[in-house]
Amino acid sequence: MTTTRVCIDSSVALKIVRHCQESAPSIVAGQLLGLDVDGELRISHAFAFPQNAAGGNPNSDDGLSLRLKAVAKYQPEMIDHLKEVNVDSNSVGWYQSTVLGRIYNASVIENLAVFQEKNPDSVVLVYDVAGSEVVSDTDPSSTGPQGHTTTTPSGFNLRAFRLSEEYLNVRKSGKFDTATLTENNLTYHDVLVELPVEIKNSNLATLLLYQLGQQYPNSPFAESSFSNLNVSVDPFLEKNIEAIFDSVDDFHYDQGNYNYYQRQMTREQAKITQWQQKRKAENAAREKDGRPALPTDEWKRLFKLPTEPSRQDNLLISAQLNEHCSVIEEFGAAVNSKLFATQGGLL
């Protein structure tokens, strides 16, 4: 992996946002095309996948299946057509919409692993429909001399992710047990690596925005933001709290399965210890009688230890729970300020 940041052409970003917004609440996806230039992944084009590539249910944890026959047939055909018009045809990942940051599911992880096997620099661009509110800002400082704007969680929620080296190493071993996770230092914090996202305008678009800013300067009324006076609790925050409850339920269910495995393991190990002590006593008696000792490893044939369940689900659920908590921590500060201001009669 050589790229450390993602740069998206503004027209591509608008195309992604429009596709995701118009298809909401259905979950949709599309192909990303671009190049790796000096450690920067430049995304210059994108096109949508067929609608049936999506699960359709925004509340489902199943995510998208990008290996359907319709997608497998449509993707190469579309790339061939783009080659004919000299568009970058190098696949650098895919984009998809989501609701409430639900990206930590087996489908997203598996799709990303397949993409990174073909191109280690591949990423997934995630646009959160529920957490995005695209705001227009004509302040010249927001575009800058290079025409750059950045994404913020409180507004334009477009984020780039890639699987970490630790996760790929564990996946390569084929074992998601506790020993393998510990050996590779993999925790729920390290499943995905988030890359900084930068949106770049072309020089002509930057010039146009500058001219419009000079021609229609902001008035004091246009700069006012009366939304700050709204004291109602953000519905987005409420939905995240509900999502936390769902994630906690999933976590308890998965933890219950693991606790059952541990009880079974403890029970079997107690039986093995008892058998070994008995065999040790038998060998001591046989030694006194001058008879050969019995083998001490027969317990491997007599007892079968339970197999540890995969810890992948636990990793993903924990990571998703942490994602919801981070959102609440970020948005909760603003909501608490409004509530305290209301209580103090300041609004």
From Swiss-Prot:
Give the compositionally biased regions (Polar residues). Answer: 138-155
**Family designation:** Belongs to the eIF-3 subunit H family.
Q: Where's it found, cell-wise?
A: Cytoplasm
| Region Disordered: start-end pairs | 136-155
Taking the first listed entry, what is the main subcellular location of this protein, grouped into a coarse class? cytoplasm
Q: Name one GO molecular function term.
A: metallopeptidase activity
Traced from the root, the source organism's taxonomic lineage reads: Eukaryota, Fungi, Dikarya, Ascomycota, Saccharomycotina
Keyword Protein biosynthesis present in the record's keywords: the answer is yes
Fetch the Gene3D superfamilies from UniProt: Cytidine Deaminase, domain 2 (3.40.140.10)
Task: Summarize the protein's role.
Answer: Component of the eukaryotic translation initiation factor 3 (eIF-3) complex, which is involved in protein synthesis of a specialized repertoire of mRNAs and, together with other initiation factors, stimulates binding of mRNA and methionyl-tRNAi to the 40S ribosome. The eIF-3 complex specifically targets and initiates translation of a subset of mRNAs involved in cell proliferation.
Q: What is this protein called?
A: Eukaryotic translation initiation factor 3 subunit H
Q: Which organism is it from?
A: Yarrowia lipolytica (strain CLIB 122 / E 150)
